[in-house]
Structures are given as structure tokens and as C-alpha cells.
Amino acid sequence: DSSFKYHLMSAKNNGVTRAEIAEILTHAAFYAGWPKAWAAFRMAKEVWANEDDGADAKARHQNEMAFPIGAPNDAFAKYFIGQSYLASLSTEQVGVYNVTFEPGCRNNWHIHHAKTGGGQILVCVAGRGYYQEEDKPAVELNPGDCINIPAEVKHWHGAAPNCWFSHLAVEVPGEGTSNEWCEPVAEKTYGILR
């Protein structure tokens, strides 16, 4: 059934790993029955067929850049679809962080507020990802690309569906700065990106 395959692909694009889908289908087999589960396992095997072992892909991505991937970004996990990582590079004068996104991971729409100054600068350092402002088309980001985000602009950024992505996030100094986290990026918005 192609509709089930679509749901499996959506799960993969939203960060569900091969190991996690195997656990989910194993659990479901006790309720739906093993014959149906085996059919689901075959479809899942097709969807995750070209996926590298996550540890190998992560190690290859780390080798593409000089900055550390960092630790799982658990403090902000509720504002992300998929797994992100955070490495603090500097907190003096200007905050600089390396943010890494697993394939398909992206943050929610958000706004960097400021009374004066503020905003954020993104510098892509490895992989491939996207940045999008509200009511504008998404912009593909590759190593060396730089995005200047003024304060008060609603936007999101994250990895391409099948590629790791890392960017430096530079906090632009300002007065009265704060972040407002908004809704997740709609699947129809993200789903058209490759």
C-alpha cells in the first residue's frame, strides 16, 4: 500500500531512525499480527535501504568541518523536529554556536526580538540545509553561505531531508533581546524541499 510507504517516508524525514522504526513495528506486531508486521518491515527496509549507519554518517559529517558537532540539544528539543546538536564556541562579546542538524531536522518558526540591534547571522560550515523567511521561498545553504537575519523576522532553518547540516549561529548584540518560538514548519512546506 503506497499510503503506508508515504507515512514511513514522512517518519524518516522527521528523524525516525532505522532502529526506532524496527522497535515501533515490533511493538505494533503484537497488536496487528505478525503477517501484517512482516509486510510493514519489508516496506521499512525499502525506505531505509540507503541509510548509512547513523554513527558512520555523523562521523563523516564531523570530518567535513573544523567545529565540534557538540552534545544533543536537549534544552531546545521541543522547538525542533528531529535531532539537533549544539556546541558553544564563544559566549564572550558575541555568542557563537555550532548547531548541527541530522537529516530532516529543522527548528520551528521563530523570531529574534530586539528593541534595537539584535537578530542572528548563520554561516553554513558543513552539509546542506535551508533557511526560510515567512512568505518567502526557502534558500538552500551550502558551506560558506551566510544569512543575515534582522530582528523581528519570522523564519526557520534546518537540514535538507537526506543530508546532515551544520551552521554557526552568531547572536547579534542588541537591547531587549529575546526569542519567540512559534509553530513547527508544516510538512507541506518542508516536504517540497530536496
For the regions a protein language model found, what residue spans apply to each?
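Short, charged/polar surface micro-motifs in flexible loops or helix N-caps
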Residues: 92-94, 102-106, 128-129, 175
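Conserved short histidine dyad/triad with adjacent acidic residue
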Residues: 97-116
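Histidine-centered divalent metal-coordination motifs
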Residues: 7, 110-114, 155-157
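Conserved metal-binding segment of the jelly-roll/cupin
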Residues: 101-104, 141-162
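Hydrophobic alpha-helical segments
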Residues: 1-60
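A short, N-terminal "cap"/entry segment at the start of jelly-roll beta-barrel domains
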Residues: 57-97, 108, 178-194
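A short beta-strand-loop-beta hairpin characteristic of the jelly-roll/cupin
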Residues: 106, 116-143, 153
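A short hydrophobic beta-strand segment most commonly corresponding to one strand
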Residues: 162-181
